[in-house]
Amino acid sequence: MSLLAQLDQKIAANGGLIVSCQPVPDSPLDKPDIVAAMALAAEQAGAVAIRIEGVANLQATRAVVSVPIIGIVKRDLEDSPVRITAYIEDVDALAQAGADIIAIDGTDRPRPVPVETLLARIHHHGLLAMTDCSTPEDGLACQKLGAEIIGTTLSGYTTPETPEEPDLTLVKRLSDAGCRVIAEGRYNTPAQAADAMRHGAWAVTVGSAITRLEHICQWYNTAMKKAVL
């Protein structure tokens, strides 16, 4: 059975939650063994897949979880706004570390390596390719190039202002066009994740609301301060 078919079964049985285990950089939680522990806890709680950033974190996580891992490498480049898995060597390192799915930036922006080249390299390793997109045009272009999974990950992050709510319209447009969509980006409540599934998402990735303790504390502190002012 193919990995996509296996995921279809897991999603049908468990609801389609993917947990992104990416601690705040330099957080006390930003250590491979802690990332792996969070991933294992997420798997035991019913996550159908895990999203991991960085080769060391991926290696540590691969050793303890059996669910599929979406691997990425983030870089801050001087000559490109693209941050997610921008280079061939990133793809190779993630494949060697045990990723099942490799996600790349799928936006139409200046980049060091073309999207189609990165997709070909992912498929060279026999892995599934996911593209993190920001618009319907991004997603449909990446689907035509052969990406098996389209993520709404970058919606709201390629523009001057980031909305507070997730982009359900993008989820629906891509789903209606026949894309296998992972809804991602600002899904901070179970209700929002469920809404994404109703809009046609194949699965939903949740990160900050589950694995970024600093963000969660900030949300509570902000709301509670407003209540007493």
UniProtKB/Swiss-Prot annotation:
A Pfam family of this chain: NanE
Pathway the protein takes part in: Amino-sugar metabolism; N-acetylneuraminate degradation; D-fructose 6-phosphate from N-acetylneuraminate: step 3/5
GO biological process: carbohydrate metabolic process; N-acetylmannosamine catabolic process; N-acetylneuraminate catabolic process
Organism domain of life: Bacteria
InterPro entries named among the record's database cross-references: Aldolase_TIM (IPR013785), NanE (IPR007260), RibuloseP-bd_barrel (IPR011060)
Reactions catalysed, as given in the entry: an N-acyl-D-glucosamine 6-phosphate = an N-acyl-D-mannosamine 6-phosphate
EC numbers for this chain: 5.1.3.9
Gene3D superfamilies referenced in this protein's UniProt entry, alphabetically: Aldolase class I (3.20.20.70)
Gene Ontology MF term list: N-acylglucosamine-6-phosphate 2-epimerase activity
One cellular-component annotation, GO: cytosol
Sorted UniProt keywords: Carbohydrate metabolism, Isomerase
Enzyme class (EC, first level): isomerase
Family, as annotated: Belongs to the NanE family.
Function: Converts N-acetylmannosamine-6-phosphate (ManNAc-6-P) to N-acetylglucosamine-6-phosphate (GlcNAc-6-P).
Stated name of the protein: Putative N-acetylmannosamine-6-phosphate 2-epimerase
Species, as recorded: Shigella dysenteriae serotype 1 (strain Sd197)
Record gene name: nanE
